[in-house]
Amino acid sequence: MYYIVETKEQLDYLSQHKTDNCFVSVIPQNDNYHPALTEPCLVYYHNGEKGYILPVNHSEAFKLDWEVIKQFITSHKVVRVLDKKYHRYFLPGDNLYDVNFIEYTDETEHDTKVHVDFNRQKYYLKEVNSLIPISKHYEKWENIYKKATEKLVFSKFYQVNEFLNTKFTEVFYQLEKNGIGIDPRKFNKHFETTWKDNSIYGNTVFTQYNLYNLTTRPSNAFNGVNFAALPKGLARESFEPNNNIFVEFDYSAYHPRIIAKMIDYEFETGNPYDEIPKEIMFQNIYGGIRDEYAWFPFFTKLNEWLDEEYKRFKLNMGLRIAGNNIILHRHIKDPNKNKILSYLIQSYETYYNVLALERILKLLEGKKTKIVLYTYDSILLDVDKSEIKKLLPTIKQELEADGFPTHMSVGENYGALVKK
């Protein structure tokens, strides 16, 4: 059978001979566009024996109905993908398994010369991938599949981490697809995007969370804007609610409390900074515990716990972090106790945040209020005024359910938030 499947009859034949497992990549109209702002161009499908191209909207082939293709893909028991969060914009997630969590593959490293030339010269075209020959898309994805096979990511001996593949991925997909409201005039004044259409639609700009970081802490940069480190001051006034008001919840003394939970320590008053001054706390948890402060009970217990954790790390195959995930030794350069503690803090921070966000997303189902931005110790909500009284107390309660107190700030834009 030819590798381009462009009729319903050909797809039916492929369906009759399908296996339980497959590998799929939805190729968008433009790789540089945010997935919320583009549509499928082609689908690369590999059944374990041969790779195929299923055309959706390409200049060289007849179009297969996208709903029929979706039905075909979802009929498989296991669909392996690179980047499940991206594929959730096009496919249901129940049978998607993200092999990037086993071994990350940079798709751009396999771009053909044609891909490179078109993306350099025609990056602004919304449907640039429909101009690149199908044979070149096929060549690229055949190479990616071959390399992934060599890395054994499809092997039954390697399982995708359940927490990362389910809760973690779904939470950040749900957040990301909301976008965040902007005043376009102010935004253009303070931020320089690579190409506006890649991430902006009307009064909304789309963020993009990168989930493939060593400690699982996601970064968030897209189209030339780093949303995880937005400059303070007037630049933040560029972000405005699409509903009525911005409400931010941020955790108080988050990292000291996370550490206390990890080592089973309880602060006497409940506030870490009543026991240890804030400056001393931060110097010692991030820079190593100094001898002159080691007498603090919190630091004494942390030192003992960290000694044992470091011993386990050296004896085992790697560092076990939150979510039953492991960072292998070969991925940790020049390991030491401070680095191990930092990695653990970041992983547990992300883990507890995901659990809280999952609960809040359930609360917001069917509501106008949306979560529009996540940073490591805070979330920003675009709140509808009709939902303020009922929703906000419940959201605060869910955020604090794991024992981490929050502060609430309110403002008409992101630069005008005032603590309440």
Give residue spans per PLM region.
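Conserved RNase H-like, two-metal-ion catalytic cores of nucleic-acid enzymes
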Residues: 1-114
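Anionic group-transfer/hydrolysis microenvironments
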Residues: 27-29, 83-85, 100, 131, ...
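Acidic, glycine-rich two-metal-ion catalytic cores of nucleic acid-processing enzymes
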Residues: 31-40, 44-49, 55-62, 184-276, ...
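Conserved catalytic palm subdomain of right-hand nucleotidyl-transferase polymerases, strongest
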Residues: 81, 97, 240-255, 279-298
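Short, well-ordered loop/turn and helix-capping segments at boundaries between secondary-structure elements
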Residues: 107, 177, 260-265, 283-287, ...
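Conserved catalytic core of nucleic-acid polymerases
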Residues: 169, 173, 177, 205, ...
